[in-house]
């Protein structure tokens, strides 16, 4: 084994070679404890010495040629042993002896004070030997040390130097770890450089010097000396060489395993790029576009031709070239020289181009490019002009002085640069000012202030945060402003402001950011090691970029770091890649990573090495699926990255912190993208880990819903999505994987209902359904794949059912169900889904919600998605069903809606109804067709309590599909030990799976055994052995502690074929071993002796010192610990005593405080109570006083008002009384005055009259004696009876006057008589005016109908009675009009005056004679008062009061003279509203005539005014009324004028009564059978007859079935026509239950009844049947036919009848074929064309017609008549509109073509039908009353069918005889079969002709003619003999053709009657058997 590094604990010495002298061994003082060791650090005398021996050889360059002397040397590194306090390590240095400007080599220099050994073995070619233009063999010779040059080996990140004419050479590396440190590998390189004259080579053997922080330091330029004083590392080498610093075991350190397969040409190309590296940034994933071509040649050309090569700075390294694992000719050294020469040849060709690259520094510029601190480490080459030996010595002195700087300064600078987040100070051009007052935080003020200091570029202010950002044009200005800008305010604090660089953007070139003077800044230490195969990883500051990144959307882990996923290739490629991979990965072992970010960077570096070591496959034949090896729920690297990025969920952190809980972290989902790299095996989880992850989610996460549902759902969804992605990437398909996808599906199904009420930001139902669909699709494919393998999953039926439930709206989902496996298709889950599909698509919401209530929880969650859809459709159906028209509304109870549609409560139902436009009030919903809305989108779904109750177990058990599994216990894998050192467990577990190897090479194996003694066992015990057979890495390989484990560790999982290379020269292993042994022995012979002796002494001293130090440390530590423990105990005891005292004091104070508070509270309570009572009393008293004052004031005011009012009234009354008395007095005085005058005038007139009588005008003729007597009154008084009887009046002296009394009496009698006559005349007129009309006579006389029973219905529309008084003319007119339409013999209804209702006034049902016939007259009079209310309208529509109305009569109210215009318009509007209400409440068809009665004489313009006021023309145009007239009637009813006009109006209404509907009535069965007979039988039997006559095969069954189903569909459309819904028929008052031929029942045209009729008619349809292929075997065809016929019967009891008939038919067909066939085989049978398909369909149709049962009971019981029949009503003219389907027409055309072909072959020869027996045709049943006509018509049709094909008379007799023979054969066959059945049943039935006790209704309704034939005896011989006699009689008689046709018709009818009777009897027998 390799000895422990001898330089671990003592001061090393240094051996250095200068240009002129050799030094001596010199010892320095001991080093400082804790100081890291660095390569090339020149220690001061107080620090350390260097121990170095550099065997080297060199050839000085001569002339002006530029030569590079490759060195072949061995460098050994030392690692810190027990103590890590070494300040320095042995450094190896050599000076360059070349003075040529282009001769650049790496040299290790030391100060003059450092001594060196004089013994340095050098070997190499002689100086000055020149090879011509060719290549010659190199000679080896020892040269003095002053000519030796040490050429360090550059790594992929440390590019070699290159001068103007120099190209870096290629090299090989043989490496092995040395020491117990981090395990670096020793490079073994063969570099070579050629030029035009000299070819030289040298070898450098170097061992790795491992320590905690070994690094190369970059030299310092003269211009930046002050800046480089802060650099922590030391530089070594000449001015022409530059090394950048590296951390522990970094790729650039000695001991780095440099890849041998990286040619020098690529190094030359990368040199141009490495001069100016891009700024550090977060690493982006590699783009596939960038990975297309990675050849070194192409990359070099791109580097040379690209004008801006810095833009390619973020490209990953090129792919490693492919090397075949094959033996090569020549020796090892010869092959090496050849390859180096070839690479240098190509490099020389591109040298001129590379010299123009911008990456090289011009002469005079700085030595190296400045890379910001800590971001990356590279070896930066530079090109410097020629320097002399004096300049080199002066530079060495400066460097040595700088090497002694304190490490503390370097640490401070490193920390400062690290705090900037990996950003160079040169890029900091902005400052950030905080704590700025608001009045100063203004852009103008800040710009003005800082413009005085430097030139400001832009200013950003944020007053809310009291900060501002000021950008300057350069770093110097920003630094000056940061220094002097604090004068703005005393509280202002200024910091640097760093830009946040997006990881998706490329970085700008460094030279655009920096000036020439700034480009020479030194490279800082890199905090991480970097892979030699990839770009360095940038380490951004954890506290800067990460914490200040945008919180909106953080980049995902796998999105930022896209990985490739190709496994390591096999063969030589795999060997080469594995070798370099293991070599590179071994350098990572032991690296310390303290923080999570450092650990992530280290693991990411490991992944990049592994990813670049693999070879991508482009051959699909060799492609294979990934195999995951991740043992944890989340890969380790992702855990560290997400903790760094703060991308952890609340379920993945340690409670109370933001640190990741490694046991609870679950892999996050990463969306796939085009530029994403393929995953590595350890990034994918195998099936077992995925199952454990799912078990963890189910048991630990699913039921955690205490926090945010959004976080819970996002976490579970994301992690299950990641599980699905891992399954997809690994192409897993097994039952375990299926169970994982099933659990994901259950989770999404549960969330579909559970999360439906969450906002869109938390839960998106659409995305959830998409994921559910993807899961179900994956399951469907996996089920199919596993079924193909013979594996059946137990849950397949469950999830296929879920798939169907998810796609219920998909049209072809049933087709997919038919494709399921029979076990799955017939499972309860799939059957349930099919039932849900049927309920949803048929809008059967009752069935749907019943299924929801009976469903499982997950099924109910899926059905919940359709709740809004089914509810909307159900609401639409209810709205249409419960409303009559669009203008009417219907009230429906809200509780019914909640119950039927399964709402949670009334509130949810109300919201849903309001969303669809319906209003809810008082617990009822108002259904209205016009108000119903159908929004475009569905309303927001809500959770259902009914579904929630089904969740009886935890969510985890629901998702798991059963009881929860045990909680998974697993300890996550960690690649770091307790000291945070990388130990590489992941590497040990991944490489055996992902690495492929072709085979072992004996030589390589031997080489590994030879160097096994030098392997560091403790460090590399976990490393795998690299493949020793790789020709690309002929170096010393690493071998683990157990050699036996190496083969298994590197054994390939699969061994792909390797193409055999072309034959090449073969060299043996002995040659290789010999050459390598010689080289190693010669190079190490002297060096190993010195190193071993010094190492032994060092180890001895170190052991002694370490023992003493350990004892001292243990003693000191123990003493300190004991003292600390004792002090703590004492302090704790004192603290306890103090706490007890304090608690006692606090308790005492607390009690005192409580006592004081109690007393104080009591006092305050008493005071507050007293104060409160006082305030309340005062307030109460004030209120009472105020109230009393107000009351007193009101009383006084009232009293005063009363007194004033009384005084005023007294004054007013006194004045009024005075005026009244005055006026009365004046009137009385006037009266007295005139009365007195009148009295005086009367007295004067009397006096004058008396005087005139007493004193005549002339002297009296009597004497004087008689004069006095003459003046005395002499009239007779009293009058005597005698004079009175004589008619005389004695006037005395005046004489006697005769008076006639009889004339006066006669006049008196005449007057009295006239008065009586007039009185009775008026009374008769009044009686006549109030007498009812003789409506039956008027109707029978004027109704234009010819039916024997006539119906007429009139609706009187009267004004509102509430608006008129009982004695008003309008009220009298209404009563008069009611009386006119009330008959004496009528059934008078409830005649009331209630407005807003329609009442039956009278109903007439009498017989009336018209001419010589008597008709039944049925009249109904309805009356409506005023406008109807909504409830009255609903009652009218519900009770169908207006159904069958024949006319309307509207009475207008009388016009009042004082009526204003507004009131008149209002009366018109009221009448119009009343009229429109009635017109809209009745069915729309037919339109009715209208009579408008106008009271009083309104003048000539009354008709025009009525038309305009009622808008009668508009009503006519709208087809609401058919016609109208305006009739003026008197406003009084004293004469017959009104009666005459009303009678005329009634006659006009009757004459214009709507025409009678052409409705036909039949029972449902009769209607179907007549339709089938009319439209199907005639066509079908005619086609069958033609095809049989032509010996053609039967018609295809699908065509016959389609014709039959088409006829049924036509019949269903006729009987359920939409025209029937709007018909106003029958008259409701005369309708009967069950209906009749004249009057149907009330619900005959309701939509529900018509829909039931349509469904019932369609129930006769036959299922479709396709014709089997022509070559189908007989038995499968028979099975298909039997299976088809089993679908026809409606019950299992009638199925055997049809089955036996079909089997009998098939047996006869087979027997017929067997008789025709000569030698039939057992497996053969009749062909498909020979099967009588038409007869099979005929049997099915016959059975369907006999065995049909209605689908369910009718909607209304009124549809059933007394005998149980259902009558249907239809328009007869619609039956003529049937169109034959296209398939039947095509079949008929095909038949005609075949007939033509048949006739063409056989000429006019008639073809006799076959004599085989076939079933009878369809049973024809007809309507009662049309039996004879139908029978005769059918007979005539049959005759026409027989004669249709004959055109000549000579063919007539033959056609007739053929038909008779056919009928005869059919009769004979049937009678034989019947006799056979009767003989079998003779024991059970004594009389075979007796009918059974029960007969179907279809058979009972046979025509009478057929019933009479049923009594014919069933014996066959009498019938046959009678038929034969009739036939012979027809043949013998020489009667005419007409008589023959008649005889033929009679025979056919008789034959059919016999068949029907036999069929009837047979059916009866079969039904009795079934009973």
Curated annotation (Swiss-Prot):
UniProt modified residues of type Asymmetric dimethylarginine: 32
Phenotype on disruption: Embryonic lethal at 11.5 dpc.
Biased composition (Low complexity): 232-253
Modified residues (Phosphoserine): 424, 502, 531, 550
Residue ranges, annotated region (Disordered): 1-50, 214-406, 1793-1840
Catalytic activity: L-lysyl-[histone] + acetyl-CoA = N(6)-acetyl-L-lysyl-[histone] + CoA + H(+)
Protein name according to UniProt: Germinal-center associated nuclear protein
Signal peptide: none
Main location class: cytoplasm
Keyword Transport applies: yes
Superkingdom of the source species: Eukaryota
Family note: Belongs to the SAC3 family.
GO cellular component: chromosome; cytoplasm; cytosol; nuclear membrane; nuclear pore nuclear basket; nucleoplasm; nucleus; transcription export complex 2
Coiled-coil region(s): 1124-1162
Induction per the UniProt record: Up-regulated in B-cells by CD40 stimulation and bacterial lipopolysaccharide (LPS) (at protein level).
GO MF annotation: an example: histone H3 acetyltransferase activity
Post-translational changes noted in the entry: Phosphorylation at Ser-502 is induced in B-cells by CD40-stimulation, but not by bacterial lipopolysaccharide (LPS).
């Amino acid at each position: 084994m390799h000895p422990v590094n001898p330089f671990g604990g003592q001061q090393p010495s240094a051996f250095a070679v200068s240009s002129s002298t050799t030094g001596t061994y010199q010892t320095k003082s001991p080093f400082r404890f804790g100081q890291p060791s660095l390569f090339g650090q020149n220690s001061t005398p107080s620090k350390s010495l260097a121990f170095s021996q550099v065997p080297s050889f060199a050839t000085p360059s001569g002339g002006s040629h530029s030569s590079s002397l490759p060195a072949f040397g061995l460098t050994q590194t030392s690692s810190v042993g027990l103590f890590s306090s070494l300040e320095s390590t042995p450094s190896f240095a050599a000076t360059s002896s070349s003075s040529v400007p282009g001769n650049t080599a790496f040299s290790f220099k030391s100060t003059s004070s450092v001594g060196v050994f004089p013994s340095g073995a050098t070997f190499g070619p002689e100086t000055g030997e020149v090879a011509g233009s060719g290549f010659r063999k190199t000679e080896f010779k020892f040269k003095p040390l002053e000519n030796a040059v040490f050429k360090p080996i550059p790594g992929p990140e440390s590019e070699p130097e290159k001068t103007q004419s120099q190209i870096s050479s290629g090299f090989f590396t043989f490496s092995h770890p040395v020491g117990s440190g981090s395990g670096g590998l020793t490079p073994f390189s063969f570099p070579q450089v050629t030029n035009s004259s000299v070819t030289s080579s040298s070898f450098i053997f170097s061992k790795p010097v491992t320590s905690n922080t070994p690094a190369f330091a970059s030299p310092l330029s003269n211009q930046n000396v002050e800046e480089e004083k802060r650099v922590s590392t030391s530089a070594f080498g000449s001015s022409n060489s530059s090394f950048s610093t590296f951390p522990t075991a970094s790729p650039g350190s000695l001991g780095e395993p440099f890849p041998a397969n990286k040619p020098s040409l690529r190094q030359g190309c990368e040199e141009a790029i490495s001069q100016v590296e891009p700024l550090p940034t977060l690493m982006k994933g590699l783009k596939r576009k960038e990975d297309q071509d990675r050849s070194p040649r192409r990359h070099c050309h791109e580097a040379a031709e690209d004008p801006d090569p810095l833009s390619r700075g973020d490209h990953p390294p090129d792919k490693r070239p492919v090397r075949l694992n094959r033996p090569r000719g020549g020796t090892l050294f010869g092959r090496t020289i050849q390859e180096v020469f070839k690479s240098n040849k190509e490099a020389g060709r591109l040298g001129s181009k590379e010299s123009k690259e911008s990456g090289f520094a011009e002469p005079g510029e700085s030595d190296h490019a400045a890379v910001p601190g800590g971001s990356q480490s590279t070896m930066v080459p530079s090109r410097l002009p020629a320097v002399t030996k004096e300049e080199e010595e002066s530079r060495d002195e400066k460097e040595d002085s700088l090497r002694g700087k304190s490490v503390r300064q370097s640490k401070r600078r490193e920390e400062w640069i690290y705090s900037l987040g990996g950003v160079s100070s040169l890029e900091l051009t902005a400052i950030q000012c905080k704590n700025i007052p608001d009045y100063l935080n203004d852009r103008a003020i800040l710009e003005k202030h800082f413009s005085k200091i430097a030139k400001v570029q832009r200013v950003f202010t944020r007053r809310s945060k009291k900060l501002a950002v000021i950008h300057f044009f350069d770093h110097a200005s920003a630094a000056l402003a940061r220094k002097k800008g604090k004068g703005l305010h005393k509280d202002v604090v200024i910091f640097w402001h760093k830009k946040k660089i997006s990881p998706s953007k490329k970085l700008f070139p460094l030279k655009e950011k920096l000036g020439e003077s700034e480009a020479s800044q030194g490279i800082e230490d890199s905090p991480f090691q970097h892979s030699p195969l990839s770009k360095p990883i940038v380490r951004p500051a954890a506290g800067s970029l990460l914490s200040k990144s945008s919180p909106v959307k953080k980049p995902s882990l796998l999105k930022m770091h896209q990985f490739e996923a190709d496994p390591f290739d096999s063969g030589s490629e795999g060997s080469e890649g594995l070798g370099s991979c293991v070599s590179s990965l071994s350098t990572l072992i032991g690296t310390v990573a303290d923080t999570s970010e450092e650990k992530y960077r280290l693991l990411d570096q490991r992944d990049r090495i592994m990813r670049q070591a693999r070879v991508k496959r482009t051959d699909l034949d060799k492609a294979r699926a990934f195999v995951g090896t991740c043992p944890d729920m989340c890969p380790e690297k992702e855990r560290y990255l997400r903790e760094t990025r703060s991308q952890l969920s609340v379920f993945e952190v340690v409670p109370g912190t933001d640190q990741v809980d490694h046991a609870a972290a679950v892999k996050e989902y990463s969306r796939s993208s085009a530029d994403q790299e393929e995953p590595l095996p350890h990034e994918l989880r195998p099936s077992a880990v995925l199952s454990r992850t799912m078990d963890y989610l189910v048991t630990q996460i699913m039921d955690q819903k205490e926090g945010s549902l959004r976080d819970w759902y996002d976490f579970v969804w994301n992690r299950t999505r990641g599980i699905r992605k891992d399954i997809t990437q690994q192409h897993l398909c097994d039952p375990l994987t299926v169970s994982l996808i099933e659990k994901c599906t259950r989770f999404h199904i549960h969330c579909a209902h559970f999360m439906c009420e969450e906002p869109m930001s938390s839960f998106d139902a659409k995305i959830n359904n998409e994921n559910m669909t993807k899961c179900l699709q994956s399951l469907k494919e996996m089920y199919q794949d596993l079924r193909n393998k013979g594996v059946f999953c137990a849950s397949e039926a469950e999830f296929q059912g879920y798939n169907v439930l998810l796609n219920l709206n998909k049209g072809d989902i049933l087709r997919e169900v038919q494709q399921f496996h029979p076990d799955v298709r017939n499972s309860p889950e799939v059957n349930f889904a099919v039932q849900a599909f049927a309920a949803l698509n048929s809008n059967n919401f009752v069935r749907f919600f019943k299924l929801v209530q009976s469903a499982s929880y997950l099924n109910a969650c899926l059905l919940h998605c359709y709740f809004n859809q089914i509810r909307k459709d159900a609401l639409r159906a209810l709205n249409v069903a419960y409303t009559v028209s669009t203008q009417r509304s219907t009230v429906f109870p809200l509780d019914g809606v909640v119950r039927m549609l399964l709402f949670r409560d009334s509130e949810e139902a109300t919201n849903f109804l309001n969303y669809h436009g319906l209003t809810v009030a008082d617990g009822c919903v108002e259904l209205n067709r016009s108000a119903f809305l159908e929004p475009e989108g569905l309303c927001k779904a809500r959770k259902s309590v009914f579904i929630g109750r089904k969740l009886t177990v935890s969510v985890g058990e629901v998702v798991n599909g059963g009881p929860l599994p045990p909680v998974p216990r697993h300890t996550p894998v960690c690649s770091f030990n307790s000291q945070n050192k990388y130990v590489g467990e992941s590497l040990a577990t991944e490489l055996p799976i992902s690495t492929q190897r072709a085979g072992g090479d004996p030589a390589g194996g031997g080489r590994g055994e030879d160097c096994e003694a030098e392997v560091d066992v403790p460090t590399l015990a976990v490393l795998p052995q690299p493949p020793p057979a790789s020709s690309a890495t002929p170096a010393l390989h690493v071998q683990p502690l157990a050699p036996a484990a190496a083969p298994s560790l590197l054994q390939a999982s699969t061994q792909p074929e390797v193409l055999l290379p072309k034959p090449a020269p073969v060299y043996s292993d002995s040659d290789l071993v010999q050459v390598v042994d010689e080289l190693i022995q010669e190079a190490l012979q002297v060096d190993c002796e010195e190193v071993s002796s010094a190492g032994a002494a060092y180890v001895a001293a170190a052991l002694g010192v370490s023992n003493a130090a350990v004892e001292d440390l243990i003693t000191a530590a123990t003493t300190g610990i004991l003292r600390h423990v004792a002090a703590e105990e004492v302090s704790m005891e004192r603290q306890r005593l103090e706490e007890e005292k304090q608690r006692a004091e606090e308790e005492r104070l607390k009690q005192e405080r409580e006592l004081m508070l109690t007393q104080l509270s009591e006092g305050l309570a008493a005071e507050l109570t007293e104060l409160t009572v006082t305030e309340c009393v005062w307030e109460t008293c004030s209120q009472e006083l105020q109230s009393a004052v107000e009351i007193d004031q009101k009383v006084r005011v009232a009293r005063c008002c009363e007194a004033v009012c009384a005084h005023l009234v007294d004054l007013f009354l006194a004045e009024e009384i005075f005026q009244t008395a005055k006026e009365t007095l004046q009137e009385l005085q006037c009266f007295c005055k005139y009365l007195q005058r009148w009295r005086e005038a009367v007295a004067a007139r009397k006096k004058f009259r008396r005087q005139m009588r007493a004193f005549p005008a002339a002297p009296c003729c009597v004497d004087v004696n008689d004069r006095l007597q003459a003046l005395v009154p002499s009239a007779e008084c009293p009058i005597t009876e005698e004079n009175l009887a004589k008619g005389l009046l004695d006037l005395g002296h005046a004489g006697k006057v005769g008076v006639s009394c009889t004339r006066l009496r006669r006049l008196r009698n005449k007057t009295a008589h006239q008065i009586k006559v007039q009185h009775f005349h008026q009374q008769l007129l009044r009686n006549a005016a109030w007498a009812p009309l003789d409506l039956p006579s008027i109707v029978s006389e004027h109704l234009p109908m010819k039916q024997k029973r006539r119906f007429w219905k009139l609706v009187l529309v009267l004004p509102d009675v509430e608006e008129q008084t009982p004695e008003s003319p309008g009220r009298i007119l209404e009563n008069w009009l009611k009386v006119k339409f009330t008959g004496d013999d009528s059934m008078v209804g409830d005649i009331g005056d209630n407005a807003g209702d329609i009442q039956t006034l009278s109903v007439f049902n009498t017989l009336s004679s018209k001419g010589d016939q008597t008709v039944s007259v049925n009249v109904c009079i309805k009356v409506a008062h005023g406008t109807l209310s909504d409830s009255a309208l609903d009652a009218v529509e519900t009770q169908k009061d207006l159904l069958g109305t024949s006319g309307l009569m509207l009475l207008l109210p009388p016009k009042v003279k004082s009526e204003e215009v507004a009131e008149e318009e209002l009366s018109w509007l009221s009448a119009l509203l009343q009229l429109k209400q009635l017109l809209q409440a009745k069915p729309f068809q037919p339109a009715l005539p209208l009579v408008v009665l106008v009271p009083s004489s309104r003048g000539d313009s009354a008709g025009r005014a009525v038309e305009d006021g009622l808008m009668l023309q508009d009503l006519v145009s709208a087809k609401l009324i058919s016609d109208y007239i305006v009739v003026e009637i008197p406003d009084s009813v004293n004469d017959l004028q009104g009666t005459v006009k009303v009678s005329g109006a009634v006659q006009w209404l009757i004459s214009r009564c709507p025409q009678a509907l052409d409705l036909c009535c039949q029972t449902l069965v009769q209607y179907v059978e007549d339709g089938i007979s009319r439209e199907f039988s005639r066509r079908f039997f005619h086609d069958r007859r033609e095809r049989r006559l032509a010996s053609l095969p039967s018609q295809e069954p699908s065509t016959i079935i389609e014709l039959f189903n088409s006829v049924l569909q036509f019949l269903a459309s006729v009987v359920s026509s939409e025209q029937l819904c709007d018909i106003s028929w029958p008259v409701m008052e005369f309708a009967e239950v069950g209906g009749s031929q004249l009057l149907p029942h009330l619900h005959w045209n309701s939509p529900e009844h018509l829909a039931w009729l349509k469904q019932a008619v369609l129930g006769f349809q036959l299922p479709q049947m396709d014709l089997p292929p022509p070559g189908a075997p007989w038995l499968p065809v028979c099975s298909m036919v039997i299976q088809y016929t089993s679908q026809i019967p409606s019950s299992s009891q009638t199925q055997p009848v049809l089955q036996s008939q079909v089997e009998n038919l098939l047996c006869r067909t087979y027997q017929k074929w067997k008789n025709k066939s000569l030698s039939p085989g057992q497996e053969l049978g009749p062909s498909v064309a020979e099967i009588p398909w038409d007869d099979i369909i005929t049997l099915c149709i016959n059975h369907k017609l006999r065995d049909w049962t209605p689908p369910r009971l009718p909607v209304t019981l009124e549809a059933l008549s007394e005998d149980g029949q259902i009558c249907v009503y239809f328009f007869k003219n619609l039956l003529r509109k049937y169109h034959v389907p296209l398939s039947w027409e095509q079949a008929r055309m095909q038949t005609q073509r075949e007939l033509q072909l048949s006739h063409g072959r056989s000429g006019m020869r008639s073809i006799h039908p076959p004599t085989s027996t076939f079933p009878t045709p369809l049973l024809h049943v007809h309507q009662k009353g049309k039996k004879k006509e139908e029978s005769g018509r059918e007979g005539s049709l049959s005759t026409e069918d027989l004669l249709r094909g004959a055109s000549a008379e000579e063919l007539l007799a033959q056609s007739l005889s053929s038909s008779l023979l056919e009928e005869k054969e059919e009769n004979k066959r049937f009678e034989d079969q019947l006799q056979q059945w009767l003989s079998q049943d003779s024991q059970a039935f004594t009389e075979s002709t007796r009918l059974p006790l029960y007969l179907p209704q279809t058979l009972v309704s046979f025509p009478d003619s057929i019933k009479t034939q049923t009594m014919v005896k069933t014996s066959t011989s009498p019938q046959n003999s009678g038929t034969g006699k009739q036939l012979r009689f027809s043949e013998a008689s020489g009667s005419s053709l007409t008589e023959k046709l008649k005889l033929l018709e009679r025979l056919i009818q008789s034959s059919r009657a016999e068949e029907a009777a036999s069929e009837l009897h047979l059916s009866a027998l079969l039904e009795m058997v079934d009973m």
